[in-house]
Amino acid sequence: MQNQRLIKQQQQQQQQQHQQAMIQQAMMQQHPSLYHPGVMAPPQMEPLPSGNLPPGFDPTTCRSVYAGNIHTQVTEILLQEIFASTGPIESCKLIRKDKSSYGFVHYFDRRCASMAIMTLNGRHIFGQPMKVNWAYATGQREDTSSHFNIFVGDLSPEVTDAALFDSFSAFNSCSDARVMWDQKTGRSRGFGFVSFRNQQDAQTAINEMNGKWVSSRQIRCNWATKGATFGEDKHSSDGKSVVELTNGSSEDGRELSNEDAPENNPQFTTVYVGNLSPEVTQLDLHRLFYTLGAGVIEEVRVQRDKGFGFVRYNTHDEAALAIQMGNAQPFLFSRQIRCSWGNKPTPSGTASNPLPPPAPASVPSLSAMDLLAYERQLALAKMHPQAQHSLRQAGLGVNVAGGTAAMYDGGYQNVAAAHQQLMYYQ
């Protein structure tokens, strides 16, 4: 049964590819001027079969498309000529902006609009990838300004708003989901936000969905940074509702991003450690993160009555690596710890004051190699990043307490991946 389904899907994909090839060939014959290398290039990314749709949006009744990230040299006449390649156009409107323009194209037939999304999304016009999607009014989305938002990281490139919403739809108060898209490349930025009407549902979603598979990747969930919203409803000067897309951009070309998120802010150097057992002490937590060897530890705090603690590092990259390595750790006092970013940045100008190595446990004791390893950590904190890298390479194979090998190199190349970690709020 499963094999038959796969065969059917492959056949549908082949038919779709053949149909697209036929359409593109016809477009080149009808509009050869558009395919001059300096004007319009072939597709540079896979087309969206149905656009990046909001929850509940019905494309079967839509005949309008949004075109974003349009090169400033494109005129309204040229835009109309480009989109007319997929079918007769009822109207075309180009709104010019300083950096990139946007526009709306209304077709007589929705099939022509669908084909425009499939064949023109990602096409390079004057070297700039154009974004094409279904156009719809903001009124089609629920107002989520007072809802509870969670951050979802490590998303697969193919995950759309609809797919993300579907993954969280089991939670009754889930109200919206949006994937953030890169304004320049038209590709997913690998993270998004999900809204909930009920705070408890949001917390439950974080607990249950963190680490679950969505498409081809395990996602990471946590509370969104304060101020990270989907954007307020906007209205144009004529009182009409402004069209806003689900791919993280509005019709004014602004990208709805989370630039101040801790994974993007070098001022964040503190790791939040949750799900701690009541018997875990500050010394226990210090020992654990010391053995990880992620970097120079400056402060360790534990709230035993609340089941969490904080570990502050010398640099942002060290903290990012500690989050990644900490989440891969086995149990600490019979519990799997959960690591993410602390909720406050380290104040500018904070002097570096590394903690000394933690007091040795009765078994095993800290060896001379452990102390040497910590001295190397202190040296790393004072060196140029390139020199740090060289020293890390030279430090391969150094063992520390608990048998952790290659403490300076293990997983360090994956710091960028660790930057998708999330924010915690008390």
Curated annotation (Swiss-Prot):
The modification Phosphoserine is found at residue 250. The keyword Aminoacyl-tRNA synthetase does not apply. Pfam families: RRM_1 (PF00076). It is found in: Nucleus. GO terms for molecular function: mRNA binding. Keywords: mRNA processing, Nucleus, Phosphoprotein, Repeat, RNA-binding. Residues 63-137, 148-226, 269-344 form the RRM domain. Residues 1-26, 230-268 are annotated as: Disordered. GO terms for biological process: mRNA processing. The keyword Secreted does not apply. Residues 9-26 have a biased composition (Low complexity). Heterogeneous nuclear ribonucleoprotein (hnRNP)-like protein that acts as a component of the pre-mRNA processing machinery. Functions to facilitate the nuclear maturation of plant pre-mRNAs. Interacts with UBA1A and UBA2A. This is Oligouridylate-binding protein 1A.
